[in-house]
Design a protein with these regions (language model features):
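Hydrophobic alpha-helical segments embedded in the membrane of multi-pass proteins
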Residues: 21, 142-145, 160-173
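Membrane-helix interface "capping/anchor" motifs
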Residues: 175-180
Length: 180
């Protein structure tokens, strides 16, 4: 367990750096648009879809209809359907953690758990997948809450913060591409 945790922490460090920054940006933008720290935290805990959370700010401030919100959510997150299908075999031994693993399958988490894991014994792979998922989720929540708190204290221009999400995905994808 200790070695698996160590490997999971090491694997998620680049995601941690990105999620703390991106979550911080999300929290700042939420506060800049008049939303509470509690709502920023709740969205990060229960929605946990970075790009959709950024889009949701515009939908909420623009008074989007339920149909528009549903269609936008489907469009932005359709890739998760393909992620989920491709992970069915990998998550077959996940037991009671399976629903959470499916929920927590972000772009970055997918890139860390979908590849070969030769340094993880077979019986530890479900634990590794869960640890990566939980750690990444914690990083995102932490960044969002700290950003919202900071956004309530500091007055800053939030223009351009949203592009950071795309940059993180490209960085993680490139690293995985070059490594595998």
């Amino acid at each position: 367990m200790k070695k698996t945790l160590s490997v999971a922490i090491s694997a998620t460090l680049p995601v941690m750096a990105g999620y703390l920054i991106l979550g911080f940006g999300f929290g700042i933008i939420m506060k800049a648009n008049g939303f509470s720290t509690a709502l920023a935290a709740a969205m990060s805990i229960f929605i946990y879809a970075g790009s959709m959370q950024y889009v949701a700010i515009g939908l909420m401030t623009g008074g989007a209809s339920l149909v528009t919100t549903a269609l936008t959510t489907l469009t932005v997150n359709i890739r998760h359907l393909f992620y989920g299908v491709s992970m069915l075999d990998k998550y077959k031994n996940a037991g009671s953690a399976k629903p959470y693993l499916i929920f927590a399958l972000t772009d970055e988490t997918y890139s860390l758990v979908c590849g070969e894991l030769p340094h993880i014994p077979q019986e530890e792979k479900p634990r590794y997948q869960l640890l990566v998922s939980v750690l990444n989720h914690i990083y995102w929540i932490t960044g969002s809450v700290v950003g919202a708190v900071a956004g309530g204290i500091l007055q800053c221009n939030s223009k351009g913060i949203d592009i950071a999400l795309t940059a993180l995905f490209l960085t993680v994808f490139s690293d995985q591409w070059l490594t595998n």
